[in-house]
A protein has these predicted regions:
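N-terminal polyanion-binding entry modules of DNA glycosylases/AP lyases
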Residues: 1-119
């Protein structure tokens, strides 16, 4: 990742801070809700997964897929990389375009293996 990109991200964060407008699932809960943005590693990963799942669908459908990922304890990079593609696709089926999104989630996880969340 280029230093210029990180510099721009840092400037934006310094000036605007965390916006907290994306719903996340709090520990011990089932439904993502607005709570000031992601605070834990798992919540940050959930937001990234959510950005993939919400494409070309409603938030309600994406949220259902996120709930299913949480129920199967799949908000985890290694678990996404190790699960069979068709099983992952079945889990996120409510989000629509589930075969393509399963591939995208695996690609995102490969990227995050190379560039961990704490570096972004």
């Amino acid at each position: 990742m280029s230093n210029k990109f990180l510099e721009i991200c840092n400037i934006l964060y310094k000036n605007y801070g965390s916006q907290g407008w994306w719903p996340v699932t709090n520990k011990g809960e089932r439904l993502p809700k607005y709570s000031g943005g992601p605070k834990t590693y798992k919540q940050k990963l959930e937001v990234m997964f959510g950005t993939v799942l919400v494409q070309n669908t409603t938030w309600k459908n994406a949220q259902t897929a996120i709930i299913k990922l949480n129920e199967h304890d799949l908000i985890d990079i290694d678990k996404i990389l190790n699960i069979e593609l068709d099983e992952l696709a079945g889990t996120i089926k409510p989000s629509g375009y589930f075969n393509q999104k399963a591939i995208k989630l695996k690609s995102l996880c490969l990227f995050l293996k190379k560039f961990p969340i704490n570096v972004l």
